[in-house]
């Protein structure tokens, strides 16, 4: 996998068996040959390539990539600016505007480069088939990533929106890290506790209290 040269590799190799790693490689080869898969193959591991373990300050968990053409870029919730923001991302930006201020761009690459690990639990999706790759090969890898941050990382903020993301809470050492939970930003649930949750300012407060640089969320 392209992750072999990254800071994540030792933890992935420790948590996953060689068979599991090989299954991921084979899965990628077969899926991208047979059908339209998102994100583009070279961006499947974008979150882990852009945000190293030692630089991770915040983790924002997603479920799986957007399944529309041109949307997914390997970062949870993020889409290129050339593509309209999906409803959940629109609500994330609304909450950010209320919490800290307005952000013009809905491409969240700058967050990733600052240390926000934008991690989906499932890293691929077939076109038009949301969550179709859940339960196949990805969860052991992404669960290992969460555990790596919890075990080896400095004090970090885990932002878990919705029940699915919150199911990952069991992998996090809350004596060392901050876990922020709220309803999912989907239009179906955003008014049931997502709006008004102030995750961005709370994250920065925790980071500065623990001697880490805050995130410039508006950049």
UniProtKB/Swiss-Prot annotation:
Cystine residue pairs: none
Keywords of this entry: Cytoplasm, DNA damage, DNA repair, Hydrolase
Entry's localization field: Cytoplasm
Gene3D superfamilies reported in the protein's UniProt record: Uracil-DNA glycosylase-like domain (3.40.470.10)
Annotated GO CC locations: cytoplasm
Database matches in InterPro entries: UDG_fam1, Ura-DNA_Glyclase_AS, Uracil-DNA_glycosylase-like, Uracil-DNA_glycosylase-like_sf
Record EC number: 3.2.2.27
Top-level taxon: Bacteria
Top EC class, one word: hydrolase
Pfam family for this entry, one: UDG
Keyword Hydrolase: yes
Catalytically driven reaction(s): Hydrolyzes single-stranded DNA or mismatched double-stranded DNA and polynucleotides, releasing free uracil
Active site: 64
GO terms, biological process: base-excision repair, AP site formation via deaminated base removal
Molecular function terms, GO-annotated: uracil DNA N-glycosylase activity
Function statement: Excises uracil residues from the DNA which can arise as a result of misincorporation of dUMP residues by DNA polymerase or due to deamination of cytosine.
Family: Belongs to the uracil-DNA glycosylase (UDG) superfamily. UNG family.
HAMAP family hit by this protein: UDG
Protein name from the UniProt record: Uracil-DNA glycosylase
Gene designation: ung
